[in-house]
Amino acid sequence: MKNESQLKSSKRGVLLRLAIFMALMISAFIIPSSALADFGYTEDSTNYTIDTGANLVFKVKRSNGDISSLIYNGTDYNGYTNKNSHVEIGLGQSDVTISQPSSSVIMVKVVYGTLEQYYVARKGENNIYMFTYIADDSVTVTRYIVRLKPSLFPVLNTSNSWYSSYSTLEAKDIFTDTSTGYTYSKHYSDTRVMDYNYTGISNGNVGAYIVRSNHEKASGGPFYRSLIRDNTNVAVNLYEILYYGMAQTDVKRYGLQGPYVLAFTDGGEPSSKLYAGNLKTDWIDSLGIHGWVGSSGRGRVAGVGIKNMKSDYEYVVGFSNDEAQYWTKASDSNGYFSCTNMLPGTYTMTIYKNELAVYTTDVTVTAGGTKILNSITITDDPSDNDVTWRIGDWDG
């Protein structure tokens, strides 16, 4: 027979095993199912299905490269009335392939003629990194549209949204809000591209956003205004528009644009780490994306300062050529500016007082180099001219 100490030891062993069993049972209920997901992909005859290993699972159609499903925390937010999320106006039959370049990256490549679209997932992130490569005019519109189910998001009547429930004035693109008397254009937002980092929508529990790219291959410069979001009870669309061909006076640029990021959140704003000026991109260098130029192949321009600046005006320094465009804000106090991650080449540098060009020169950027400019004096501001009288001021 067991003595008293042996019985006590046996009881303690049983209780310990019971406690461990109960803890495991409880954890099975409190750990979200998404946390048990494995990073990876599967495929069938219709779709590639990518599990990010976080809360996002998405599908890409093997026929044309559309995103056909965006499942976040178990709910599919993609599409409406048989429309998916897609590049350009949607592609025809395409060559769509999938690969896993590393243990933490999955990439889908879509080739349609001379257009290439890339979707990249990183392990443990609720983000899809996207890139678009165009080589010629066979691609008429350079844009990406994320289409979301309208029943899952509120209708937002804001100044940077196109709201198609207004009364139509002209060509199905110009609308009026009879309650306020305001007129809206589908293709003209009140928000300049330099003034926003992302566009999107939230229902309080889930947010879906496009974090814009640096727009180096876009058209229009820092003050470009275009369609950003439309939002009604029948459609929610988020846009990354690089070239739309709406009588634009700037050149159409070719090559690779990206990354721009489709980011899902638990209702809040996307992380500022995804912003074009903040995003770390060294992990992209080894993916073999057509046209990609890493940070080592780029350069910088810095200006010591700007003289003859007028108070109460913002000064922006823009750079452009036929291959790329960039911009940066000058310091309000002394006009210091720095523009980083520029592709090599010779650029027209323009200083803007608000949106008025007041100084222009050429600068050359080299890979890995920094071009330092001595203090610049603005000489082309018409506000400096003597006049008899003037209403307002020149500001573009």
Give the ranges of each region predicted by the language model.
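A short, amphipathic beta-strand motif
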Residues: 297-308, 335
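Beta-strand-rich N-terminal accessory domains
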Residues: 36-81
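Structured interaction patches on ligand/partner-binding surfaces of diverse proteins
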Residues: 355-374, 378-381
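Beta-strand-rich domain onsets/edges
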Residues: 274-300
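A contiguous, surface-exposed recognition patch within enzymatic or periplasmic domains that forms
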Residues: 149-256
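A short, solvent-exposed beta-strand micro-motif common in secreted/extracellular proteins
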Residues: 335, 344-355
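Extended, loop-rich substrate-binding clefts of extracytoplasmic carbohydrate-active enzymes
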Residues: 80-133, 143-145
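Short, acidic Ser/Thr/Gly-rich low-complexity loop/linker segments typical of extracellular
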Residues: 321-338
